[in-house]
UniProtKB/Swiss-Prot annotation:
Chief subcellular location: secreted
Statement: the UniProt record of this protein carries the keyword Transmembrane: no
Keywords, sorted A to Z: Complement alternate pathway, Complement pathway, Disulfide bond, Immunity, Inflammatory response, Innate immunity, Secreted
GO cellular component assignments: extracellular region
Name of the protein in question: Complement C5a anaphylatoxin
Protein's job: Mediator of local inflammatory process released following cleavage by C5 convertase. Acts by binding to its receptor (C5AR1 or C5AR2), activating G protein-coupled receptor signaling and inducing a variety of responses including intracellular calcium release, contraction of smooth muscle, increased vascular permeability, and histamine release from mast cells and basophilic leukocytes. C5a is also a potent chemokine which stimulates the locomotion of polymorphonuclear leukocytes and directs their migration toward sites of inflammation.
GO biological process: complement activation, alternative pathway; complement activation, classical pathway; inflammatory response
PROSITE patterns found in the cross-reference section: ANAPHYLATOXIN_1, ANAPHYLATOXIN_2
Gene3D superfamilies registered for this protein in UniProt: Anaphylotoxins (complement system)
Disulfide bond sites: C21-C47, C22-C54, C34-C55
């Protein structure tokens, strides 16, 4: 589900460089926030926006998936 959401978001960007920024933002990094990671981007504001958008979407999907009810067969 996460991959599908990120693919949909990346498809909104016309240029390959911006798509890469989006995919980079989707990578999991529990040590830093999206803002902290985006602060290191030097390419330009469009890349930063794509990075943050995908980072926030990925974090949201991960949070939703981690709270699913799991039934154990006992």
């Amino acid at each position: 589900m996460l991959q599908k959401k990120i693919e949909e978001e990346a498809a909104k960007y016309k240029y390959a460089m911006l798509k890469k920024c989006c995919y980079d933002g989707a990578y999991r990094n529990d040590d830093e926030t999206c803002e902290e990671r985006a602060a290191r981007i030097k390419i330009g504001p469009k890349c930063v926006k794509a990075f943050k958008d995908c980072c926030y979407i990925a974090n949201q999907v991960r949070a939703e998936q981690s709270h699913k009810n799991i039934q154990l067969g006992r």
